[in-house]
Curated annotation (Swiss-Prot):
Co-factor(s): heme
Name of the molecule in the record: Cytochrome P450 116
Function of the protein: Degradation of thiocarbamate herbicides.
EC number: 1.14.-.-
Record: residues binding heme: C375
Entries under SUPFAM superfamilies matching the protein: Cytochrome P450 (SSF48264)
Keywords per UniProt: Heme, Iron, Metal-binding, Monooxygenase, Oxidoreductase
Inducing stimuli: By EPTC (S-ethyl dipropylcarbamothioate).
Length: 437
């Protein structure tokens, strides 16, 4: 049911009346897009689980409820996680069909027991020791991009640094050959609006074309990597797992993780790091602290992920009749679980709206999920954020936000990061002599 406003007397599927607050909830515009966690402050207090007629979803806002949903996949299935939240137009479906687009299951939307079997076999490249081997390359790429703007005195952190670098790192991690990185970069950002947004028909048509082209390209890349016995990266590892376990991994599965992996490893890190820089620079004393003492950066990262994470909400489907926060959810009921709201729940985080890099339990945020579906790439994302903050704070500690700028975000339910973060500094004051004009 998709309406701008719930009609008079509308009820949830369980027959309960829908409150005015629930009827007015619109995740595609207004308060949720400005600040999703603050927009649900009243809901956390008065109506922590409510039915949204606009979405046809139950919205869950409190920490403990969301934690239990994550940890009970036998009751709350992840199967709808990457379903389009806005129905796909016939024209867009035809376009996708012309590319033989066949989206299937990936780790993010798989049920047990196959999820755990596949995750165990695909996990090795994500283990901390293996991810750590990428740090010198990440640092090299970050500094290469910083070199391009360091003497200018002004930059857009997103356009000049945070968009490109995570994309390059993601593709290196996946095992994409150097000559294909530029093509992957062009196609890799199609998914957010299409899957989690509210695109118009024209937008669906445009994005479907890009997604179809990338789907074809992803399949060709898998074939290319299969033919290279010396290829390194996550996709070559998955190809080897297919050789050893053909019953668990077919070609469509490999194409799906190539297709989805670019998005998962790229955009979420771009958004998380953009949010972190904005938050730290708006809280100047915290920025100055990490510039003076870089050992504080890991704690600052956890607080940034809690306070303004890039993954705002996930979705689940009730497998059986169940209850969340004393609200009955019928089998088949769909839930939007808003981690951004959970991360501001004062039952878990005292003074939750205060940004505090010394917070003792910031790492208990739910931005990366919890349980068997914890984000597979969390270690890589944290490493990239650490290197970004270390290098920028070392070379541009005097950097500040351009005054008066307005921050914009792509309207969608689940992912959040500023489209631009404009900063400025006096290049004559750059602490590294070689960085001065």
């Amino acid at each position: 049911m998709t309406v701008d406003h719930a009609p008079e007397g509308v009820k949830s599927p369980t027959g309960c009346p829908v409150s005015g607050m629930a009827a007015d909830f619109d995740p595609f515009r207004g308060a949720y897009q400005v600040d999703p966690s603050s927009s649900l402050r009243q809901a956390r207090k008065d109506e922590p689980v409510f039915f949204s007629p606009l979405l046809d979803y139950w919205v869950v806002t409190r920490y403990e409820d969301i934690k239990q949903i994550f940890k009970t996949p036998s009751v709350f299935s992840p199967s709808i996680t990457v379903d389009q939240i806005t129905p796909i137009s016939d024209e867009a479906l035809q376009i996708l069909g012309s590319y033989q687009f066949a989206a299937g299951r990936m780790l993010v939307n798989e049920d047990e027991p196959i999820h755990t079997e596949r995750r165990r076999l695909l996990m090795q490249p994500f283990e901390a020791d293996n991810v750590a081997t990428l740090e010198p390359k990440i640092r090299e790429v970050v500094n290469t991009y910083l070199d391009r703007v360091i003497k200018d005195g002004r930059a857009d952190l997103i356009g000049d640094l945070l968009y490109e670098v995570p994309c390059i790192v993601a593709l290196i991690f996946l095992g994409v050959p150097d000559e294909d990185i530029e093509t992957c970069r062009q196609y890799g950002m199609q998914q957010t609006l299409f899957t989690w947004g509210h695109p118009t028909g024209d937008e669906q048509t445009r994005v479907a074309t890009g997604m179809g082209k990338f789907w074809e390209f992803a399949g060709g890349l898998v074939d290319k990597l299969k033919a290279d016995p010396n290829a390194k990266g996550w996709i070559p590892h998955a190809i080897e797992m297919q050789r050893q376990h053909p019953d668990l991994f077919d070609d469509n599965y490999l194409q799906n993780i190539m297709f989805g992996g670019v998005f998962a490893a790229h955009e979420t890190t771009t958004n998380a790091t953009g949010n972190a820089f904005r938050t730290l620079l708006e809280n100047r004393s915290s920025w100055d602290e990490i510039c003076a003492d870089p050992t504080l950066i890991p704690k600052a990262i956890e607080e940034c992920l809690r306070y303004s994470g890039s993954v705002v909400a996930w979705r689940r489907k009730a497998v059986v009749d169940t209850t969340v926060g004393e609200v009955d959810i019928p089998a088949g009921g769909r839930l939007l679980i808003v981690m951004a709201s959970a991360n501001r729940d004062d039952s878990m985080f005292p003074e939750p709206d205060d940004f505090d890099i010394h917070r003792g339990n910031a790492q208990r945020h739910l931005t990366f999920g919890i349980g068997s579906h914890t984000c597979l790439g969390a270690t890589l994302a944290r490493l990239e954020m650490k290197v970004f903050l270390e290098e920028v704070s070392r070379r541009l500690p005097h950097m500040s936000l351009v005054a008066g700028q307005e921050f914009s975000y792509l309207p969608n339910t689940s992912f959040r990061g500023p489209e631009h973060v404009l900063v400025e500094w006096d290049p004559q004051q750059n602490p590294v002599p070689a960085d001065r004009p």
